């Protein structure tokens, strides 16, 4: 049994190092930038640049992988990520960092597409669910481990940037020494907005707005923590627990949505996330434990929304179209993450650190309002015609290639 999973474990080891490096680097940069006196606008633009680079990578990386092959392409992406991480430690300048974050987003998209296509090819119809579950587990654990590492050293020193570079280099070893056959060439990415909207207006608008909220929080959450005066260790724990809380709540919320109209569950979670955001804005908590508890409650609701939206879209998708629909929604989510950091930074600059939650609350309130409007205009999908809910990571942008690994994908879609 374990022999069949050996090549998958090798890929997952590389994934773990890659995500740990990404998690650490993504948290380290805003903390160091805040300590260096970077403007809020610049810190927000770093998140926008990363998202723009990631989306561009989703479109362009397949061409590069076809030319160089999976192993060489992944090695190139990981090496570039390491060089960029070390470069951000050498050159402390907000303009340089914004440009380098765009490059990081691009190479991370390419690296994820290679790994996800490789995992998809190694998975069979019988073990696809297990492989997908392992991938989700590694994703959450690695990001959390990377983020918690930031508390082990002074963010003002270069040592953490070196650790990021080492982790990126370690990620390329499992694929570089692998003797397994490389997968089929990556497929080009396309985005049919009209067809996506016709399939599910709620999922279309929802995924974009979820990207706005998650992009704002993911980029500026650490800046919010630093400005209200909580410690680096508390910031790392806060950012990690938001992700973990969302992962834990996804299954019970998903099961409820399997038994009723998913849109009611989506609207309820969006309202809850908006209310918690409003409470944080008004209460202006400054105690570390209180802030961590409130943001964990926020994450538990906010980070279930993406999986609910994708599940709702899949309920309406015709047989064999899940990968295309899910891939399109991932790109919409990515476009949303370009907007969120700029919106959050503008509000934080105009008012106070807690204004970050005005940006997230506005996005979540818009999701709830539009979902409730659509409930009146379109009947729900009968229970017997729905696909079962599956958890999805909403703490980072995914790639359309990863949608083919989801067990809901039909065999012909993964071909």
Each language-model region and where it sits:
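Intrinsic disorder in cytosolic terminal tails and internal cytosolic loops
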Residues: 1-3, 183-191, 315, 374-415
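Helix-loop boundary and gating motifs at the non-cytosolic
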Residues: 2-51, 203, 215-224, 228, ...
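Helix-to-loop junctions at the C-terminal end of transmembrane segments
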Residues: 57-70, 150, 154, 249-261, ...
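Structural signature of the two symmetry-related core transmembrane helices
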Residues: 72-86, 165, 264-279, 361
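Cytoplasmic helix-loop-helix junction between adjacent transmembrane helices
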Residues: 102-137
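Intracellular juxtamembrane helix-capping segments at the cytosolic ends
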Residues: 110-123, 303-317
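C-terminal membrane-cytosol helix-exit motif in multi-pass small-molecule transporters
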Residues: 150-151, 165-185, 367-375
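C-terminal transmembrane helical hairpin of 12-TM major facilitator-type secondary transporters
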Residues: 263-307
């Amino acid at each position: 049994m374990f022999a069949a999973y050996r090549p998958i474990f090798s890929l997952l080891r590389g994934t773990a190092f890659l995500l740990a490096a990404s998690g650490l680097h993504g948290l380290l940069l805003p903390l160091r930038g805040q300590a260096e006196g970077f403007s809020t606008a610049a810190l927000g633009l770093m998140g926008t640049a990363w998202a723009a680079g990631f989306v561009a990578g989703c479109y362009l990386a397949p061409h590069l992988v076809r030319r160089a092959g999976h192993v060489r392409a992944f090695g190139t992406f990981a090496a570039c990520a390491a060089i960029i991480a070390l470069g951000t430690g050498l050159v402390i300048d907000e303009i340089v960092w914004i440009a380098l974050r765009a490059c990081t987003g691009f190479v991370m998209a390419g690296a994820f597409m290679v790994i996800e296509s490789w995992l998809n090819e190694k998975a069979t119809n019988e073990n696809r669910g297990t492989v997908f579950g392992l991938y989700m587990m590694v994703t959450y654990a690695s990001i959390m481990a990377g983020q918690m590492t930031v508390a082990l050293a002074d963010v003002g020193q270069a040592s953490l940037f070196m650790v990021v570079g080492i982790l990126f280099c370690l990620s390329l070893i499992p694929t570089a020494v692998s003797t397994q056959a490389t997968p089929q060439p990556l497929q080009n990415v396309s985005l049919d907005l009209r067809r996506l909207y016709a399939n599910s207006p709620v999922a279309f608008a929802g995924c974009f707005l979820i990207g706005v909220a998650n992009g704002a929080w993911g980029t500026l959450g650490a800046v919010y923590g630093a400005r209200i005066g909580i410690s680096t260790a508390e910031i790392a724990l806060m950012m990690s627990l938001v992700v973990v809380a969302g992962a834990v709540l996804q299954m019970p919320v998903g099961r409820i949505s399997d038994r009723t109209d998913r849109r009611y569950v989506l609207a309820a979670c969006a309202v809850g996330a908006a209310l918690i955001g409003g409470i944080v804005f008004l209460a202006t908590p400054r105690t570390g434990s209180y802030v961590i508890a409130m943001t964990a409650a926020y994450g538990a609701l906010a980070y279930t929304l993406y999986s609910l939206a994708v599940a709702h879209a899949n309920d309406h998708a015709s047989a064999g179209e899940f990968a295309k629909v899910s891939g399109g929604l991932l790109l919409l989510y990515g476009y949303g993450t370009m907007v969120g950091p700029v919106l959050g930074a503008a509000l934080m600059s105009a008012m106070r650190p807690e204004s970050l939650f005005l940006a997230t609350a506005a996005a979540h309130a818009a999701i709830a309002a539009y979902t409730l409007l659509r409930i009146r205009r379109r009947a729900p999908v009968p229970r017997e015609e729905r696909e079962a809910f599956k958890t999805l990571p909403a703490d980072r942008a995914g790639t359309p290639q990863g949608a083919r690994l989801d067990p809901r994908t039909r065999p012909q879609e993964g071909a």
